[in-house]
Regions:
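Short, small/polar-rich loop/turn modules that mediate ligand/substrate recognition or access, typified
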Residues: 35, 131, 136, 191-193
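Substrate-binding pocket helix/loop in short-chain dehydrogenase/reductase
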Residues: 50-51, 55-63, 161
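Active-site helix of classical SDR
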Residues: 74, 115, 123
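Alpha-helical segment proximal to the catalytic Tyr-Lys
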Residues: 79, 128-129, 189
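Residue(s) in the substrate-gating loop at a strand-loop-helix junction
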Residues: 98
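A glycine/serine/threonine-rich, flexible loop-to-helix segment
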Residues: 107-108, 132, 139-165, 175, ...
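Short C-terminal tail/terminal secondary-structure segment
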Residues: 181, 192-210
C-alpha cells in the first residue's frame, strides 16, 4: 500500500525452492515487462538445532531457499536484465547475505551461516561472469535487524545483542533501504562483486573479541 502512490505494485507469490515456481514467476513478469533494471534476491530461511540432532531437512530447506533460489532466479531473469543494462549504467542484482556468512555466529544454525557464505561467494562468481553482459551483482550482509526471523532471538537477548553492537542499536528498515538504494543507483555503477556489511560494526566487534 505504501508504494501504490508511486505506481502499480504487483505481488506474485512463489515457492523459490521449486524450479517450476521460479519459471512461473519469470513467465508472469515477462508477460508484463519488457526489461528488468533491478533484481533483489531476498528470500531467506534459517533453522536452529544442536549439532548432534541437526536434521537433513533443516539443511536442505535453508540451502534451497538461501542459495539455490538466487542462482536460478538470476539465471531466469538474466535476459531481461541484459535488456536494461548499459556499460555506463548496468542493471543490478542485489543478493541478501548475512554477517553470519563472514564471522562465526554463536547460535547453532549450521546451515544458515554456510548458506550465507555461499551467497557471498556466488555473488563474486556471478559478478565476474555477468559483468560483460552489463549486469552488476553485489550483496548486502545485514547484522542484527528486527525481523520475523529474529523475533524470538530478540525477545530473549535484545539487550545483550545491542550491547555487542558498536552503534548500540538494532538495525532498522531505513538502514537496509539505504544500502539497497546505493547499490541500485548510478553511484554504484562501477561497483560489482562486493559484500557490503550493514551491521552497526558487529563484525569488527567480533574480531576484537577474538
Amino acid at each position: 500500500m505504501r508504494l501504490s502512490k508511486f505506481g502499480q505494485c504487483i505481488s506474485i507469490p512463489a515457492d523459490l525452492t521449486q524450479i517450476n515456481e521460479i519459471q512461473n514467476l519469470f513467465s508472469t513478469v515477462n508477460k508484463n515487462e519488457k526489461n528488468l533494471h533491478i533484481l533483489v534476491n531476498n528470500a531467506g530461511a534459517a533453522w536452529g538445532a544442536d549439532f548432534d540432532n541437526f536434521p537433513e531437512n533443516g539443511w536442505d530447506k535453508v540451502m534451497d531457499t538461501n542459495v539455490k533460489s538466487i542462482f536460478f532466479l538470476t539465471q531466469k531473469f538474466v535476459k531481461l536484465l541484459e535488456k536494461s543494462g548499459t556499460n555506463s549504467d548496468p542493471s543490478r542484482v542485489i543478493n541478501v547475505g548475512s554477517i553470519d556468512g563472514i564471522g562465526i555466529p554463536r547460535a547453532e544454525t549450521y546451515s544458515y551461516p554456510a548458506s550465507k557464505a555461499a551467497v557471498h561467494q556466488l555473488t563474486r562468481v556471478l559478478a565476474n561472469r555477468l559483468a560483460e553482459r552489463n549486469i552488476n551483482i553485489n550483496a548486502i550482509a545485514p547484522g542484527p535487524f528486527q525481523s520475523q526471523m529474529m523475533n524470538e532471538t530478540l525477545k530473549k537477548y535484545e539487550k545483550e545483542i545491542i550491547n555487542s553492537v558498536p552503534r548500540k542499536r538494532i538495525g532498522v528498515p531505513e538502514d537496509m533501504a539505504g544500502a539497497a538504494i546505493f547499490l541500485s543507483s548510478k553511484a554504484s555503477a562501477y561497483i560489482t562483486g562486493i559484500v557490503l556489511p550493514v551491521d552497526g560494526g558487529s563484525l569488527i566487534a567480533r574480531r576484537h573479541m577474538v
